[in-house]
Amino acid sequence: MKSRTGALPSRKQIALIAHDNKKQELSDWVCTHKKELEQHDLFATGTTGYKLAAETGLKVEKYISGPLGGDQQIGAKISTGEIDVLIFFWDPFEPMPHDPDVKALLRIAAVWNIPVACNPASADFVITSPLIKQSYERQIPDYEAYIAERTKKL
C-alpha cells in the first residue's frame, strides 16, 4: 500500500483504555502524569473514563464500554485521524470475551502508525518523550491512492 505523510498535532488526542484488572493501575499512572495529560485531549472507554474523571478531576470524553463496542469506537477514531496516541493497559493473564475487538484496535493503531503503550513503563516513555508536545510527521496509508487503485479495477 502506498503511504503519505500525516501530522500528529502538538496537542494530542489521547485514548485511555484499561481492562478491569488494570483500571487502578491506569488511574494511578494518570494521577502521576496529570500535569502532562492536562495539555492534551483525553478519551476513554466507558467505565475507565468515569473512573479516571472521578479520581483525577481531568476532563475525559467517554465512549461506551469496551465489550459493548467502545474499543471499536476508539479504533474508528484512529482511522479518521481523531486519536493520536493509544494508552491501553490490557491484562495479559485474563482472556476477554471481546479479544477480537482488542486485536482489531491494536491492528488499526499499527496501520495508522500511532504510538501505543500497553503498560506503565511504555506509557512513561510515551508521555515523557519530547515528541508528545510537538507536531510529528509520520507515514500513514494513502487512502485516496488506495481507493483510486481499487476502483480502477471495477
Curated annotation (Swiss-Prot):
Keywords, sorted A to Z: Lyase
EC number: 4.2.3.3
Regions crossing the membrane: none
Catalytically driven reaction(s): dihydroxyacetone phosphate = methylglyoxal + phosphate
Active site (catalytic residues): D71
Top enzyme category: lyase
Biological process, per Gene Ontology: methylglyoxal biosynthetic process
UniProt protein name: Methylglyoxal synthase
Native source species: Saccharophagus degradans (strain 2-40 / ATCC 43961 / DSM 17024)
Gene: mgsA
